[in-house]
Amino acid sequence: MNTGLEISILHNLEMSKLLDTINSPSDLKKLSLDELRELAVQIREELVNRVTLNGGHLASSLGVVELTIALHRVFESPKDKIIWDVGHQSYAHKLLTGRREQFATLRQHGGLSGFTCRDESPHDPFGAGHASTSISAGLGMAVARDLAKEDYSVISVIGDGAISGGMSFEAINNAGHLHTKFIVILNDNGMAISPSTGALSKFLNNVRFDPRFEFAKRNAKQTITNMPFGKAVWAFTKSIKRKFEKSMLPGSLWEELGFIYLGPVDGHNIRELEAALKRAKDFESKPVLIHMITKKGKGYDDAEADAVKYHGISPKSGGLKSSHGLSYSQVFGQTLHKIMSQNPQVVAITAAMTDGCGLGEIAAAFPDRVFDVGICEQHAVTFAAGMATQGYIPVVVIYSTFLQRGFDQIIHDVCLQKLPVVFAIDRGGIVGDDGKTHQGIFDLSFMSLIPDMVVSAPSDENDLQHLIYTAVNSGKPFALRYPRGFGEGAEIESSLHNIPIGQNEILVNGSDVAILATGKSVAFAKDALEILTESGIKPTLVNNRYISPLDSELVLKIAQSHKYLVTVEENVISGGLGSRINTLLAEAGLVNKIKIANIGIPDKFVEHGNQSLLRAKYGLDGKGIAQRVLSLVGNPNEMKHPQIICP
């Protein structure tokens, strides 16, 4: 017979294996409430351990553990479609949908994505990485289901930050109009929307959440409308109810938009969550919004105390390190701070990336001149355009991948009107572990095709500060694109000066071979020069800081005095620096007089992996550039340096 202590030990051993027993969502349905609570603890431990090793989005995933468990107990994934907005809070979802054994590879090259990915699992019905897409995608799936006369649930999970994006409201408006059966879960972690408070509010919402209330409401309507003048009485009663709700209830906005509102629900109470999800599942004729209150970073004290800091973290090992001290974002922030101190007409605008873009100290110093508009990139661009019409010089500070969302506004609202808006494009080029949705490899192409847009990419920190100064004083639409990570250790001059627009510079004079590199690629081209010099090749190296307008005079001069021309860029080749130079040489009739090679990203989406690995894979590091040059011109010292293998 087992003693109480032995039973306790056996119980603890069984509990310790809970996460290991979950191979699919169906396994969750066998667990008791106590076991589910223990499972939530184990999931959080796994998330903290793995994300601190691999890096990733921690606080968001910690906040939705109970929701993830409840979703997979109430619904039948992958038949039912669960869509995670942005996807960075889907780590627990990955653990519970058969990816536990692969979880150690999270955000590693060839491993699990840090976001949802259709290619990765049938439990990921929609890929993500950018915000505010889940409601549109979910509504599309729900309408497709109804057209095909199929039967499954569609659930979109969206945070209070992402729901501020304009695309979310477009989808909400459409969903209310269509009256499609569809569930939206609003994860309110207090970062953007204040939780409802007060005993009356809680009481009224509890009443409205109770199925008996819905039954009573239907019976009351039937009874009153069957009375003499009943329809008029019911209409009057309903109007009074709506006015009362509008002033007292947090759900009235959603009901006006055509949704049934349930909540607020404790997002860390599995029993409450399951009750809400089952209730929402029963509604047939309208979309339902469940308002869920959670704590971002739940279960990890450091993340709960500073959810912004722990939103995304770097790995303990293998993260970004530098002896140079300052990142490009920090140099940008310091330079803009100096400029704004001297010029009161300069303002900064960002879309929910104040700290990530280096604007934190500037916002503290100039709180009335730094505007965080939320996850609203389109609005950010046109808001900047409006300020520019009134004599201000707006600097829109934004990650490359998110700037894509404001492309029409850049053309229509800024460039067509020749407004002096500066676009400070952070995270240009290969960003690494966040993968396909976050690589900044298209900006040189889509910005360069716009008439009257100046497009530049600094070669180092010193180049960056002077280009910022040039942009602010240019009076033109001006884009400057800089990479993620630390600088090159360049000496930063104390005074700022203009760099003539369209003027590039020769860094090294050589012969026969000319390498025209832009941005971060200049540093790798310098590494390539060391290898090539050992091989008997002494190339010319150009810092091609301006992509548009091109320094046509310099390019043509080089083309006429060299046998080989190589372009290097961390951007898709199509439409980028290489394409623009190819076009220039073709128009000048020089393409048959010089051999050309374009080094850049091929026509594909770049997977996740650390920056060094990806640069090596795509031939963008020093060795890769040298190998490409050697394959173009041949190796005079091939026998002397057999370690260099040319493709």
UniProtKB/Swiss-Prot annotation:
Any one GO molecular-function label of the UniProt entry: 1-deoxy-D-xylulose-5-phosphate synthase activity
Enzyme class: transferase
Swiss-Prot/TrEMBL keywords: Isoprene biosynthesis, Magnesium, Metal-binding, Thiamine biosynthesis, Thiamine pyrophosphate, Transferase
Sites where the protein binds Mg(2+): 160, 189
Catalytic activity line of the entry: D-glyceraldehyde 3-phosphate + pyruvate + H(+) = 1-deoxy-D-xylulose 5-phosphate + CO2
Co-factor remark: Binds 1 Mg(2+) ion per subunit.
EC number: 2.2.1.7
Residues the entry annotates as binding thiamine diphosphate: 88, 129-131, 161-162, 189, 300, 377
Functional pathway: Metabolic intermediate biosynthesis; 1-deoxy-D-xylulose 5-phosphate biosynthesis; 1-deoxy-D-xylulose 5-phosphate from D-glyceraldehyde 3-phosphate and pyruvate: step 1/1
Pfam families on file: DXP_synthase_N, Transket_pyr, Transketolase_C
Single biological process term from Gene Ontology: isopentenyl diphosphate biosynthetic process, methylerythritol 4-phosphate pathway
Cofactor(s) listed in the protein's UniProt record: Mg(2+); thiamine diphosphate
A cellular-component GO term for this protein: cytosol
Matching SUPFAM superfamilies: Thiamin diphosphate-binding fold (THDP-binding), TK C-terminal domain-like
Matches recorded under PROSITE patterns: TRANSKETOLASE_1
Quaternary context: Homodimer.
The family this protein is said to belong to: Belongs to the transketolase family. DXPS subfamily.
Reported function: Catalyzes the acyloin condensation reaction between C atoms 2 and 3 of pyruvate and glyceraldehyde 3-phosphate to yield 1-deoxy-D-xylulose-5-phosphate (DXP).
Name the UniProt record assigns to this protein: 1-deoxy-D-xylulose-5-phosphate synthase
